[in-house]
């Protein structure tokens, strides 16, 4: 992995609690829409128009982009919105009830009229959306946003400066490439998780870092548990049946002739199961953690859940070290390549997540920094070439099984 322009990225920029089915097509647009209306200063807004471009338009229906934008215009955030109220609020809007902005102002909003779909890509990124606010026929505010994957987004001003709105936080151990990371670990006698912990202290205390990482893990664990319990078929029109629940029951009660067979393949069944559970929850639009995206959100929690289930001495400290190390690899992918499926294909999502999970596992198993980096490299290269080609634009086929395979 080569070097790029320095910017400070936190592990908490990669692991974010949000909702499914897509970090780039659901989480990012919701955040961007909220950002737009929160910045409005005009006393009277009569209309807001949203134009979705490129991939947001091409696959936005299947990813619920229009729904996400509407909820964002209401001032909601992916991490805090009450999922049980979304369908009711959208139905009310479609029944001609007004859309209420965060400042309390109500305006008529018709999704068929005020959300436009334009598959033409804008130059900066394939995931683009233009929001315009009117007072009567007069434009009072407009901005263009680009959803970069993983819930990251930038507006046009930031795009004109070249990309991410760079965080200039001074880190004790800044690195732009894997080589730099390994050199720092060797020079200072640190593991990758130890180095990442020191860098994270630039933003928050060690206690806060550990607490927040455990909160992230608990959200991941909850998505696994919810996925194992849920049955039925997934929304989206493909009629895909949830499989995690029935597979879980099979693993808990294997046929008599398999009860005494415990092999590495048995363990892999559990890893596959955990990944399926998470991604079925994601496809259903439930609460998720980007890792580093929603489309690849099953891989990191599945591998971590495997470690905690089958390693007798596993503890909370391992969870923290696993996620810190995984975050380091995600940061390298984000800085030097991309985690956006719309930009570089599924290899950028599933490949990055596989590298992150492999690195985290190698770390908690006692690997040296070089071994951790090698694990990440192997995980990444085995997913090279995967394109982002979901059937009918819905994050289900082949997305769910790709997580299990990775």
Feature annotation, model-predicted:
Residues 314, 325, 332-403:
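Hydrophobic alpha-helical bundle architecture
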Residues 24-39, 301-313, 358-366:
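Alpha-helical support elements that line or immediately flank enzyme active sites
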Residues 6-8, 12-19, 30-52, 63, ...:
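Non-transmembrane, aqueous-exposed alpha-helical and coiled segments at domain scale
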Residues 47-60, 92-99, 323-336, 377-390:
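Short, mixed-charge aromatic SLiMs
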Residues 75-259, 270:
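C-terminal regulatory domains involved in ligand/effector binding and gene-expression control
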Residues 15-33, 283-303, 346-355:
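Conserved phosphate/anionic-ligand binding catalytic regions in large, soluble enzymes, centered on
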Residues 207-345:
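Accessory "access/gating" subregions that flank catalytic or transport cores
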Residues 70-89, 118, 358, 363, ...:
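C-terminal domain-closing interface element
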């Amino acid at each position: 992995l080569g070097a790029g322009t320095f910017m400070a990225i936190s592990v908490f920029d990669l692991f974010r609690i949000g909702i499914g089915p897509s970090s780039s097509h659901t989480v990012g647009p919701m955040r961007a829409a909220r950002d737009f209306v929160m910045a409005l200063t005009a006393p009277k807004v009569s209309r807001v128009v949203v134009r979705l471009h490129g991939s947001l338009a091409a696959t936005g229906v299947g990813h619920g982009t229009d729904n996400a934008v509407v909820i964002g215009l209401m001032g909601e955030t992916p991490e805090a919105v009450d999922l049980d109220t979304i369908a009711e609020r959208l139905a009310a809007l479609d029944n001609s009830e007004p859309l209420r902005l965060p400042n309390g102002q109500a305006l008529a909003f018709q999704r068929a009229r005020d959300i436009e779909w334009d598959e033409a890509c804008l130059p900066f990124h394939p995931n683009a959306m233009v929001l315009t606010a009117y007072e009567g026929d007069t434009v009072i505010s407009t901005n263009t946003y680009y959803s970069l994957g993983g819930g990251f987004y930038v507006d046009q001003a930031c795009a004109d400066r070249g990309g991410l709105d760079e965080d200039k936080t001074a880190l004790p151990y800044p690195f732009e490439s894997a080589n730099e990371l390994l050199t720092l670990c060797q020079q200072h006698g640190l593991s990758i998780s130890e180095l990442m912990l020191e860098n994270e202290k630039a933003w928050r205390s060690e206690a806060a870092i550990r607490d927040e990482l455990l909160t992230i893990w608990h959200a991941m664990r909850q998505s696994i548990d919810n996925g194992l319990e849920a049955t039925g078929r997934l929304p989206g029109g493909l009629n895909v049946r949830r499989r995690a629940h029935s597979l879980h029951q099979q693993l808990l009660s294997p046929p008599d002739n398999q009860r005494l067979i415990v092999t590495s393949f048995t363990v892999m069944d559990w890893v596959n199961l955990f990944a399926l559970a998470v991604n079925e929850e994601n496809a259903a639009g439930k609460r998720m953690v980007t890792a580093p995206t929603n489309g690849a959100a099953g891989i990191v929690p599945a591998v971590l859940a495997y470690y905690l289930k089958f390693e007798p001495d596993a503890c909370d400290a391992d969870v923290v070290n696993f996620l810190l190390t995984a975050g380091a690899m995600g940061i390298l992918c984000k800085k030097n390549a991309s985690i956006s499926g719309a930009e570089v294909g599924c290899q950028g999502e599933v490949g990055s997540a596989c590298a992150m999970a492999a690195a985290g596992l190698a770390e908690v198993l006692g690997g040296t920094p070089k071994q951790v980096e090698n694990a990440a490299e192997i995980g990444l290269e085995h997913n090279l070439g995967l394109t982002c080609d979901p059937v009918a634009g819905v994050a289900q086929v082949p997305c769910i099984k790709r997580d299990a395979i990775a």
